[in-house]
């Protein structure tokens, strides 16, 4: 009788764990389906309307859910990231084996440091004066 109780308890714990895992991975799965949909559309010659720079970035993996370049960029005149930044971010992604968002964050923090800005956006210069709210 006690063994049956523990077996049921174990089954509920496993079921709850699977539900939590699925809820956590839901956004990743949605991103995978979106990428698969765009791949299928491109195979049937249904092009995604992007300007050329964004299309190259998409093919090279320089996008994420937070840096969405798929949605409504056909009339966007901006060129996206410059070539030097793209190459630096790709190197960071390959060397550190991290995703695009983390690589872009590391790149921006490095650029901030080169320009006298702390990673949180405050100036590093000790003579700088900032106003509190």
From Swiss-Prot:
**Disulfide bonds listed in the record:** none
> Which Pfam families does the record associate with it?
DUF2015
Tell me which UniProt keywords the record has, alphabetically: Signal
| Domain of life according to the entry | Eukaryota
Protein's UniProt name: UPF0357 protein YCL012C
InterPro entries xref list? DUF2015
> What family does this belong to?
Belongs to the UPF0357 family.
Species annotation: Saccharomyces paradoxus
Q: Which PANTHER family match?
A: UPF0357 PROTEIN YCL012C
Q: Using the record, list the residue span of the signal peptide; answer none if the entry has no such feature.
A: 1-25
* Gene name tied to this protein: YCL012C
């Amino acid at each position: 009788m006690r063994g049956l109780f523990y077996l049921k308890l174990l089954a509920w714990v496993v079921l709850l764990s699977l539900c939590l895992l699925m809820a956590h991975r839901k956004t990743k799965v949605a991103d995978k389906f979106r990428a698969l949909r765009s791949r299928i559309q491109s195979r049937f010659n249904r092009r995604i309307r992007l300007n050329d720079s964004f299309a190259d970035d998409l093919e090279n993996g320089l996008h994420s859910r937070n840096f969405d370049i798929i949605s409504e960029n056909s009339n966007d005149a901006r060129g996206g990231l410059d070539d030097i930044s793209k190459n630096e971010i790709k190197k960071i992604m390959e060397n550190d084996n991290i995703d695009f968002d983390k690589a872009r964050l590391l790149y921006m923090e490095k650029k901030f440091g080169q320009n006298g800005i702390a990673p949180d956006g405050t100036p590093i210069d000790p003579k700088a004066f900032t106003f509190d709210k």
